[in-house]
Amino acid sequence: MAFGALGGRGSRRSRRSVSARVAFGALGGVLAALVVPSAAAAHGIQLVTDLPIPEWLFAWATAIVLVVSFVALATLWPAPRLDPPHDRAWRHYPPWLDPLCGAIGIALFVLIVYAGIAGAQLVTANITPTWIYVVFWVGLAVASVLFGDAFRPFNPWRAIARATAWLVSRMRRGAPAPEPLPYPAWLGRWPAALGILCFAWLELVDNPAQRVEPRLLAFLALGYAAVQLVAMSLYGIETWTERGDAFAVYFGLFALMAPLRWADGGIHRRAPFVGAVALEVMPGTIALIAVMIGSTSFDGLSNGTVWISLFPHLFSLFTSLGVSSPDAATEYSYTLGLVGMVAIVGGMYRLGTLGMRSIGAGYEAGDLARRFAHTLLPISIAYVVAHYFSLLAFSGQSMIYLVSDPLGTGANIFGTANFQPNLAIVTGNVVWYVQVGALIVGHVGGLMLAHDRALTLYRRARDATRSQYWMLTVMVAFTSLGLWILSSTQ
């Protein structure tokens, strides 16, 4: 998106003065938030051991990029441009595509559940764990940001509910169906936030051997689907899908940032990130985003040197409180770490909005938190890419042989059962560059959205810029947190 044209020669001196004030204010925010480590190692399978430039230079370079971006936005983006978001119709898709995708989603769900129950219980031989933790959890998040809501058309429980509703309507021969219950406004997206937190607990806290057990994952998938179907029957299919279905809401939030929007039988194009402006903030939305960022952060933290030092103290705390089982004390410690990291993320954002309130204009901190919640979405996908890129690049290759032998029974359906993943497909340096690049792009995107929203809320551009000193501090703090976690990972 092009910046607005600059003014005439007479305004250059004032702009230089404004730029200087903005730069000094931004520098103050950076110095307040920047805490960077001296060691760097990529999260995932390979460690970074031979970076081409010093690690501290990476960290300061990212902070400088954020400051330069902030100054550029303050001087070259004087009026709001993104609210409301604009898109253009691009292509139409046939009406049969949606039910076809739904049928594919149901078939895949049946395959994953059947493989988990009836297949080999070895994690590397059964398709279920890799599909859930790599393709579904990570791959679909990235696909949603690139191509739009990739999960919605394939959502198996939504497809089952819609097919059931269609059959019931045919059986009733035109008789009106019972109206769904009104969805409680106070409930908002809290069910989705709780669902994502529970999945993160399964992935990061539960017993390592148990969390990847194919049969357990299959039964959990069946249980989750049953809950969704019951909730859809009570509150309506689309209402629950947009508010309560944890994974539908999770991927839907990522899809807001995609350059493509699928709606009304057509594909619409827009600039990346700008769709986040349309985020409908309801109860539980900010908590959900905090869970998204905090759980990803804890995944990296729990593999790092800081957690290795902290964990024994937490373990001793719970044993001193009467927890006799070592496994239980371990789970309690990790649970506290997970919840604590989510609270830290939420607290950092809350501090930023409390600081913005000092600018005046009559906005309360809670109102500002809701109005700027969409600015956290680019950070959430930045953390996903930074922490899971190596997982997707290396473990994702396992799908090549698993599709030929999904149950681990020795089959070779597509002739790829003997494929060996290439662990040298990307180097450690490439992993590091992708991770740092994702953090920079995500936080610059968040700054852009925050700056545009500030221009919408504050009458004077100067007040809008001053309010964003606090948001810049938050963004740099999130960047520093991400780099610190990556660098401390073992």
Residue ranges and their predicted role:
Residues 233, 241-354:
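Long, internal scaffold/assembly segments composed of regular secondary structure
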Residues 482-490:
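Juxtamembrane boundary at the C-terminal end of a transmembrane helix
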Residues 1-42:
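N-terminal secretory/membrane targeting signals
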Residues 140-145, 283-300, 375-399, 475-479:
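Hydrophobic alpha-helical membrane-insertion segments
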Residues 44-270, 284, 298-303:
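Transmembrane-helix bundle segments that line or gate the permeation/cavity pathway
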Residues 296-306, 344-355, 379-413:
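Transmembrane alpha-helix/helix-exit interface in multi-pass inner-membrane proteins
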Residues 376-384, 394-396, 400-441, 450-451:
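Hydrophobic alpha-helical transmembrane segments and adjacent short intramembrane/lumenal linkers
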Residues 449-475:
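Interfacial loop-to-transmembrane junctions
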